[in-house]
């Protein structure tokens, strides 16, 4: 009950949607999964930070991307699921060969954006379901390419609501993973393409 009271207090500080006992099956490509105690859909970075700063540390927090590579147990999730919306799915050019993408942008969207802007190196993303956040989390790849080869940096938020940027040179990538802390929430990333 204390948890629900705490979430209701946070509701007064944010305008993003907060759902209680929501079925996770509608967020999974497999249409499986039990209930999440809470799903929070922040409207922006500030709301996400406020939410995390006001939630107690003992509560479990996980981000759910596209749900394309996620199997959710029937018992659900006894904690908070963060679900990003369109605000976190932007894709744009920073420079001629530097692309920035929100963590919830679909991999295919990023690949298509690169193609439309005459950037190479992103082709492999076109056949990977999921989001850029998930791609970084698991070092997605195929056909001899992976996300670590094009990543410049990733912007993250810790569970205390603090933001930092981690250069790819400080990340140890391996096959379908990295040494990034599991508690980090990916917000956006910059990538280098070839013109």
List PLM regions with ranges.
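Structural signature of FAD isoalloxazine-binding scaffolds in flavoprotein oxidoreductases
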Residues: 33, 40-45, 71-89, 137-167, ...
């Amino acid at each position: 009950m204390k948890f629900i009271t705490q979430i209701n207090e946070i509701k007064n500080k944010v305008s993003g949607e907060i759902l209680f006992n929501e079925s996770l099956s509608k967020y999974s490509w497999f249409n499986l999964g039990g209930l999440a105690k809470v799903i929070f859909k922040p409207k922006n970075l500030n709301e996400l930070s406020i939410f995390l700063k006001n939630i107690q540390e003992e509560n479990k927090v996980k981000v759910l991307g596209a749900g394309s590579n996620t199997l959710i147990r029937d018992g659900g999730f006894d904690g908070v699921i963060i679900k990003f919306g369109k605000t976190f799915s932007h894709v744009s050019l920073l420079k001629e060969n530097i692309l920035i993408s929100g963590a919830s942008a679909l991999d295919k969207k990023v690949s298509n954006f690169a193609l439309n802007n005459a950037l190479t190196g992103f082709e492999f993303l076109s056949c990977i379901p999921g989001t850029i956040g998930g791609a970084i989390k698991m070092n997605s790849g195929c056909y001899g390419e992976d996300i670590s080869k094009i990543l410049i940096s990733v912007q993250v938020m810790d569970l205390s609501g603090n933001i930092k940027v981690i250069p790819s040179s400080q990340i140890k990538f391996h096959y379908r993973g990295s040494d990034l802390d599991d508690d980090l929430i990916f917000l956006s990333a910059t990538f280098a393409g070839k013109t």
